[in-house]
Design a protein with these regions (language model features):
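Aromatic- and glycine-enriched beta-alpha-beta binding-site module
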Residues: 90-184
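Short, structured coil/loop segments at alpha-helix boundaries
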Residues: 51, 56-65, 146, 150-152, ...
């Protein structure tokens, strides 16, 4: 999930690449749960966002990584963006994705998927306020939102330590090859269209690890760590579109770069006390 190469390039640090086909990296021992995703297909885009709009979700000890600090570090897209829109220097960086999967289980239990049911996630890059603090393995991300289209399963995930909520999320592939996705939650409606085009990147040599921290306004306190390998991805070609409507903080975000279709990886995750 969440292809390491493109995310690293876009958000400003080196990718995790090995010289031989990569196995899924080992997670730390003693996970409280086991999350498995296989056969995923997803549409991903990247956004800058106003951190003040979600300040109440930021846990103590963490801070948002900003466009400005990435530009100061020499990240080309960030420097180019600030050249056009300098007011975005203090904004955070994030990604939004809609995912459907052949297998999606937590401790062996899967959601009751509606027709074309999918999961949606909005994740933001964060770092410790104390530069010397150790957040453990994996790129740190704040799980601003995670929506699944099964109310009982959302409760089950929260009980297991995952910061999930209910959302009416769908993702389907038309016979023409175009993907259509929708998200409908209180205060937010999202519609995305993507027709994958061009060369396929990634593949068996991609692998990485991430750590999802729950938002401060969640009843969940565990950290979710995920490890994955085998991403493939294609850029979305002509006719790609995103529509975000409503009062949700993501609606004011600024799209960064291209939208991508990603698939083919294997992911294993688990929850850990923070």
């Amino acid at each position: 999930m969440w292809r390491w190469f493109l995310l690293a390039l876009l958000l400003g640090s080196p990718a995790s690449v090995v010289d031989a086909p990569a196995a899924v990296p080992d997670l730390p021992a003693f996970a409280r749960t086991r999350w498995v995703v296989e056969g995923p297909e997803e549409i991903v885009t990247y956004l800058a966002f106003d951190p003040d709009a979600v300040r109440d979700r930021l846990p103590s000890g963490l801070r948002f990584i900003t466009v400005g600090e990435l530009a100061d570090g020499g990240v080309p897209w960030a420097r180019e963006l600030l050249g056009r829109r300098p007011a975005l220097a203090s904004w955070g960086v994030s990604f939004l994705e809609l995912v459907r999967a052949r297998t999606f289980t937590v401790d062996g239990r899967a959601p009751r998927w509606p027709s074309h049911g999918a999961v949606a996630l909005w994740l933001a890059r964060v770092a410790p306020v104390d530069q010397g603090a150790d957040l453990g393995p994996g790129r740190p991300l704040l799980a601003l939102d995670l929506w699944v289209p099964d109310r009982a399963y959302a409760r089950y995930m929260r009980d297991k330590g995952y910061p999930a909520g209910y959302g009416d999320v769908h993702l389907r592939r038309e016979s023409s090859g175009r993907w259509l996705g929708t998200v409908d939650v209180p205060g937010l409606e999202v519609t995305v269209a993507c027709r994958p085009a061009g060369p396929v990147g990634g593949g068996p040599m991609s692998a990485g690890m991430q750590a999802f921290f729950p938002p401060a306004n969640s009843t969940v306190t565990d950290t979710v760590r995920v490890a994955f390998a085998g991403h493939r991805e294609q850029a979305c070609g002509s006719g790609t579109s995103w529509e975000l409507r409503g009062t949700h903080p993501i609606v004011g975000g600024v799209l960064l770069g291209e939208t991508n279709y990603q698939y083919g990886y294997h992911l294993i995750g688990g929850t850990y006390p923070r």
